[in-house]
Regions:
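C-terminal accessory helical subdomains adjacent to catalytic cores in phosphodiester-
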Residues: 2-16, 27, 31-47, 60-75, ...
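Short, surface-exposed binding/anchoring microloops in extracellular/periplasmic proteins
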Residues: 19
């Protein structure tokens, strides 16, 4: 009986995405993406930019791994509003930088309009609220069903707009890299099933 158990092939874990962020808005958005893509995504919130380090990321990855073959991809979703956070993110070499400058609201704005000129976080939120009716009552940390619908339906438009911007500069958002990885993983999963 024991011999049979040892001969079973080891189970291969699905790819896991770890997303490090510090705010409720980012957490809400990533949880929404998890529902849409139906992929294993773990959001690690409230890791402030000052506390972010390669050592901390490595410890989270190690805790998630069941076997050496597990594929765990980590992402850093932060607002690039200070030089200190830029330095911290740059030092974390094993993770994919999906930061937005000045804030995640720029990513939301790119779903409805282009943004090529420098913009502050407050101006970005104000422009987002004026962009379309569903964003008029936008509050950080909350996404309404209509806002989620826009974010889902226009994600490819936002990605195309974000790709035209210079990464790390104001304005820029690299959140499209997370969506690209999720799209690839979903396609691979569907190909294996199909």
């Amino acid at each position: 009986m024991k011999k049979e158990q040892n001969q079973r092939p080891s189970r291969k874990m699905k790819p896991v995405f770890l997303v490090f962020c510090e705010g409720e808005t980012e957490e809400t958005y990533v949880n929404f993406l998890r529902q849409q893509y139906k992929l294993p995504i773990k959001v690690i919130t409230y890791v402030t930019g000052q506390a972010l380090s390669q050592k901390k990321i490595d410890s989270y990855i190690k805790a998630e791994k069941i076997s050496l073959n597990d594929k765990i991809t980590s992402f850093l979703m932060y607002d690039l509003d200070t030089n200190e956070i830029i330095e911290k993110i740059t030092a974390c070499k094993s993770s994919i930088n999906i930061a937005s400058n000045p804030s995640v609201e720029l990513w939301f704005l790119l779903h409805n309009s282009e943004q090529n000129a420098f913009i502050s976080t407050n101006a970005c939120i104000e422009k987002l609220r004026k962009s379309t009716k569903e964003w008029e009552c936008y509050k950080k940390g909350i996404l309404t069903d209509k806002q989620k619908k826009t974010l889902w339906e226009k994600r490819k438009i936002a990605s195309a707009r974000a790709m035209k911007l210079q990464n790390g500069r104001n304005p820029s958002s690299m959140i499209y890299l997370l969506l690209d990885e999720m799209e690839k993983t979903k396609e691979e999963r569907n190909d294996r099933r199909g």
